[in-house]
UniProtKB/Swiss-Prot annotation:
Keyword Acetylation found: yes
Protein's UniProt name: F-actin-capping protein subunit alpha-2
SUPFAM superfamilies: Subunits of heterodimeric actin filament capping protein Capz
A single MF term (Gene Ontology): actin filament binding
An individual GO BP term: barbed-end actin filament capping
Biological function: F-actin-capping proteins bind in a Ca(2+)-independent manner to the fast growing ends of actin filaments (barbed end) thereby blocking the exchange of subunits at these ends. Unlike other capping proteins (such as gelsolin and severin), these proteins do not sever actin filaments.
Annotated InterPro entries: CapZ_alpha, CapZ_alpha/beta, CapZ_alpha/beta_2, CapZ_alpha_1, F-actin_cap_asu_CS
GO cellular component, one term: membrane
Protein family membership: Belongs to the F-actin-capping protein alpha subunit family.
Residue numbers of N-acetylalanine PTMs: A2
Keyword Cell membrane recorded: no
Signal peptide residue numbers: none
Residue pairs linked by disulfide bridges in the UniProt entry: none
Length: 286
């Protein structure tokens, strides 16, 4: 191990550490960071060299953050990234600094976003918040309105997590929806992601995603928002049901084909009575 460490440059060590951090399971960033910190044994190198990994993790995971003085949490996403460590809260029309390591928001200030699309953004956000409240016990959503390639675009992000470290599991749901505001009809594009880590009796991760495409009728802001939510709800319900059914089927078939739950005798060995078994007697007489 010592020879391997001598062969690795600082750049290679940081690259490996960054990979560990970016792939940390939901809710386990601190544990992975602390382990990597011990392995690297160089805090300055880790902070400077792997800072991009801290940021990438939060962007990928849609990390929710509470801003002091404001009621609702906002998601850290690439769509709200203003550069130089600043992020947008479109609902409250503010920008703020975000510490990717501490996961803290500071220095909130007024910020004027795209006014041309604001009425559409607000309508979608109102409808989406009602939907999230109904379907996600710990859900957070952020809706952005911006011009992309000259087109007015709505981007809706949803995050919901359950961190149950005491019960040895953590999980996160993320979904991102996007459509442009064009006359008559437009295309809705979405991606749904689930990541769950279970580590009580082993180390199992579920990492799944699904791409969605559907057409949306564009009329006024409120009606379009309602139709958009119908698409979101139908797709997310279908995805959740498919995941549940798939893993129930896998439990009933694939897992059982890989390993017997009981020995061939169909009974579990009582290790306290091992001497009463033939093998126990043979061992005793040996």
């Amino acid at each position: 191990m010592a020879d391997l460490e001598e062969q690795l440059s600082d750049e290679e060590k940081v690259r490996i550490a960054a990979k560990f951090i970016i792939h940390a399971p939901p809710g386990e960033f601190n544990e992975v960071f602390n382990d990597v910190r011990l392995l690297l044994n160089n805090d300055n190198l880790l902070r400077e060299g792997a800072a991009h990994a801290f940021a990438q993790y939060n962007l990928d995971q849609f990390t929710p953050v509470k801003i002091e003085g404001y009621e609702d949490q906002v998601l850290i996403t690439e769509h709200g990234d203003l550069g130089n460590g600043k992020f947008l809260d479109p609902k409250n029309r503010i920008c703020f600094k975000f510490d990717h390591l501490r996961k803290e928001a500071t220095d909130p200030r007024p910020y004027e976003a795209e006014n041309a699309v604001e009425s559409w953004r607000t309508s979608v956000e109102t409808a989406l918040r009602a939907y999230v409240k109904e379907h996600y016990p710990n859900g957070v959503c952020t809706v952005y309105g911006k011009k992309i390639d000259g087109q007015q675009t709505i981007i809706a992000c949803i995050e919901s997590h359950q961190f149950q470290a005491k019960n040895f599991w953590n999980g996160r749901w993320r979904s991102e929806w996007k459509f442009t505001i064009t006359p008559s009809t437009t295309q809705v594009v979405g991606i749904l992601k689930i990541q769950v880590h279970y580590y009580e009796d082993g180390n199992v991760q579920l990492v799944s995603h699904k791409d969605i495409q559907d057409s949306l009728t564009v009329s006024n802001e409120v009606q379009t928002a309602r139709e958009f939510i119908k698409i979101v709800e139908a797709a997310e319900n279908e995805y959740q049901t498919a995941i549940s059914e798939n893993y129930q089927t896998m439990s009933d078939t694939t897992f059982k084909a890989l390993r017997r739950q009981l020995p061939v005798t169909r009974t579990k060995i009582d290790w306290n009575k091992i001497l009463s078994y033939k093998i126990g007697k043979e061992m005793q007489n040996a």
